[in-house]
Amino acid sequence: MKINKDIRTFIDNKQIPSVKTSEITASFKTSMENQSSKMKLDQLTRLLSDIEAFGKRLTKSRNFKDLARFKGLVKRFVKEAVDSGLSHETSKSFDLYGNSRTLGLVKEIDDKLIQLTEEMMDQEKPAIDLLERIGEIKGLLINLYT
């Protein structure tokens, strides 16, 4: 049997739209970054609600075990917030003598935690003072969060 060379198969060479890998990589990268930031914000929101719950528990129980947990949650929140790239504010201000000083929001949160510990040790302080201090700490955390 002889093969006919005149018969050729015609393949339609359609132009298949080629998607560049850089476009795919860029869109994948942005979607991953968006999901990652969304997960981090969800985690920070959960930590903030845990801090609020422990703050209420701390005002009722006034024991050092709950205080240690509260401080641990606050420090974990601050660490997560700073590590995930949320801004920690530093502002420059001047005191009465004209000296400049830099105040950090994270440092201020730490100072409020120390004040809360001191107020917990003073058993004669009413619970309203503890609520005020816990409210200040929560406000600073929200300021760091937004």
From Swiss-Prot:
InterPro entries: DUF327, TM1646-like_dom_sf. This is Uncharacterized protein YaaR. Pfam families: DUF327. It comes from the Bacteria. SUPFAM superfamilies: TM1646-like.
